[in-house]
Amino acid sequence: MKYFMGFDTSCYTTSIAVLDETGCLVADKRKILSVKSGARGMAQSEMVFQHTRNLPDLLDQIIADLGTPIELKAIGVSAFPRSQPDSYMPAFLVGEGYARGLAVMNGIGIWRLSHQESHIYAGIWSAGGPNKDRFLAVHASGGTTEVVLVEKNDDVSHITLLGGSKDLNAGQFVDRVGVALHLPFPAGRHLEALALHHHANAIDIPFSVKGLQASFSGPASHVFRMLAKGYAPESVAAGVELCIARSLAKLIIAAIEKTGVTDILLVGGVMSNRYIRETIQKKVSKASFMTKLHFPDSKYSPDNAVGAAYFALQRGT
């Protein structure tokens, strides 16, 4: 049996994953970076430091879980944020360095891909599709909120940006509200827990989507005013989820109308939120009954290395 390893060292998570040659996940280790209480992020230098410290521990855990030596066939690594010539982020160099070292030592191939492509591959691996040559992908996270057109032959070959947020990303919106509510950072799962069972009392947050451009800075300012007036945190959290779901659903509908493509893959940390997923599904399905939305398991929506490993499997066999 041959194995394929993936690395992803993103803004807030160190990840390593291993797939066997059948595509079965045999190891998946992640460690969320530690952000100081009350902070709204961290410097790239701190990310690099924490990734450098985390990777040896995760590799030790991978080896311990596997139990016996394995034959690596290829390695995939997220080496830059997007598939653009000027796309660069120091944090990704940590994972790329480890991946290149392992590849050289084992005499195997290494496949570089963007962090966004890794999300797309993880989504396809988990959701079992889309299985079309052209599909839409929604990538909603703390670092990105984009709707893209993916056109492929045997693999993801070309990604065209259609639209997205022009200011704050959806995940940034969540995190900034989370910090204001004194939730741990990143705030996604904590805000989701706070909002649970409170959507009937969600505050109405005006959302702004014009064509394929959304804005979350205005909604964020509205939320801060509501908090200053003493609105219940639970109702605020529920309102944030609803605002994001409405905005993303409207972006998706606009992308469908522009391209005629009705298969949509939804990835990124924001897509791990159950209420947001369900609300998008309802609103998009109501607007266009021909659409097919593909959601990966919520475990594979946030940052992970499974997509990079799956990319290596696709390229290295």
Feature locations, PLM:
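Short glycine-rich phosphate-binding loop at a beta-alpha junction
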Residues: 69-80, 260-271, 294
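A short helix-loop
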Residues: 2, 6-10, 26-28, 131-133, ...
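Phosphate/pyrophosphate-binding loops at sites that engage ATP/ADP/AMP, CoA/4′-phosphopantetheine
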Residues: 58-73, 251-262
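Conserved phosphate-binding catalytic cores of ATP/NTP-utilizing and phosphoryl-transfer enzymes
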Residues: 1-2, 108-136, 310-311
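Conserved phosphate-binding/catalytic loops in two-lobed NTP-binding clefts
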Residues: 264, 281-308
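Short beta-strand-loop/turn "lid" adjacent to the catalytic site in phosphate-handling enzymes
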Residues: 63-99
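A contiguous, well-structured pocket-lining segment that forms one wall/lid of small-molecule binding clefts
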Residues: 193-264, 270-285, 313-316
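Short glycine-rich, Thr/Ser-proximal phosphate-binding strand/loop in the N-terminal lobe
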Residues: 10-49, 156-161, 295
